[in-house]
Amino acid sequence: MAENLKGCSVCCKSSWNQLQDLCRLAKLSCPALGISKRNLYDFEVEYLCDYKKIREQEYYLVKWRGYPDSESTWEPRQNLKCVRILKQFHKDLERELLRRHHRSKTPRHLDPSLANYLVQKAKQRRALRRWEQELNAKRSHLGRITVENEVDLDGPPRAFVYINEYRVGEGITLNQVAVGCECQDCLWAPTGGCCPGASLHKFAYNDQGQVRLRAGLPIYECNSRCRCGYDCPNRVVQKGIRYDLCIFRTDDGRGWGVRTLEKIRKNSFVMEYVGEIITSEEAERRGQIYDRQGATYLFDLDYVEDVYTVDAAYYGNISHFVNHSCDPNLQVYNVFIDNLDERLPRIAFFATRTIRAGEELTFDYNMQVDPVDMESTRMDSNFGLAGLPGSPKKRVRIECKCGTESCRKYLF
């Protein structure tokens, strides 16, 4: 039995910091965790709980890492070397003073409710940092994820699991493609039209990896059976998110949102919408539950027929947090790579315009597609234009809060 377990590993339920705390509490050294006899009794500031000023001397109530709250002590400013923690403490203090009293001058003693708020804020920051670390440990894409909440005390969402690709539900099979292209150069010298041509469609990208098809047209990328390599210009969506993105708390009642930390060029791929693939019947059952929550995470895959739905409520990637806008900067495309079943496309977001660093990413939950000239879409004359993937399931009338000039007032 032991031999069968060699080389196996499991995820630890405790974070690195939590394990270090346990070692110090138990007075155990652990070289793997960086806890030795030399630093076992070192005191490290976990966060600051309170503040007071006596005869021009500043004091802080310090919560020490690895020690209970009852062991917190008042320390003079000169004893503390934690510049980052001190700076964040005063930033949070000033912001809350402005919110409560419309002034930012620090009092000599803090009101108990204000001190309690600062403790809760410090604990929230730790929880969000742990969540950020978990997200980055699970992501398989190049782009990093940061998390930010400067609005309220909400922490990480409960029961949400970050995934990088579809989670296939019971009774659903994703059939792998059997053949691939034989191209020497898929963009400039495609053999038989490459993978798009094999499906009687046109090549989707230019030499910069930007989509050049009209919205509503499918994208066929090269697959795992193709002769071309990783650098093939027809492999874009499958390479995953390449931009650094931030999950942030909105200040206008829209919950969490996503902003880009980098400039994104027009028509560039941004992210996929992933979640659980479930049948439409199961989606109807879950939808009745989500209705009471005002949820909009059910996304119909109705490229050719409404058979399957993507549910990103509990399993999803960063697209789970992207908000609606009636004037969005992201457009949805159906993408086919290793599975060519037209009932099960992958859902990809592309930029509709140049998006500045720091700008929020949005898509239209009730998207529509303009009519497209049939001859410009597919290579044969029997093509009937299939539409965009379905919007998140439209069940209840939800008020829109996007605030754009073209706002329709309701999501659905």
Curated annotation (Swiss-Prot):
Residues 255-377 are annotated as: Mediates interaction with MECOM. Histone methyltransferase that specifically trimethylates 'Lys-9' of histone H3 using monomethylated H3 'Lys-9' as substrate. Also weakly methylates histone H1 (in vitro). H3 'Lys-9' trimethylation represents a specific tag for epigenetic transcriptional repression by recruiting HP1 (CBX1, CBX3 and/or CBX5) proteins to methylated histones. Mainly functions in heterochromatin regions, thereby playing a central role in the establishment of constitutive heterochromatin at pericentric and telomere regions. It is an enzyme of class 2 (transferase). This is Histone-lysine N-methyltransferase SUV39H1. Inhibited by S-adenosyl-L-homocysteine. Negatively regulated by CCAR2. Although the SET domain contains the active site of enzymatic activity, both pre-SET and post-SET domains are required for methyltransferase activity. The SET domain also participates in stable binding to heterochromatin. The gene is SUV39H1. Zn(2+) 4 binds at C326, C400, C402, C407. GO terms for cellular component: chromatin silencing complex; chromosome, centromeric region; condensed nuclear chromosome; cytoplasmic vesicle; eNoSc complex; heterochromatin; nuclear lamina; nucleolus. Pfam families: Chromo, Pre-SET, SET. The modification N6-acetyllysine is found at K266. Residues 43-101 form the Chromo domain. It comes from Homo sapiens. S-adenosyl-L-methionine binds at R254, G255, W256, Y297, N323, H324.
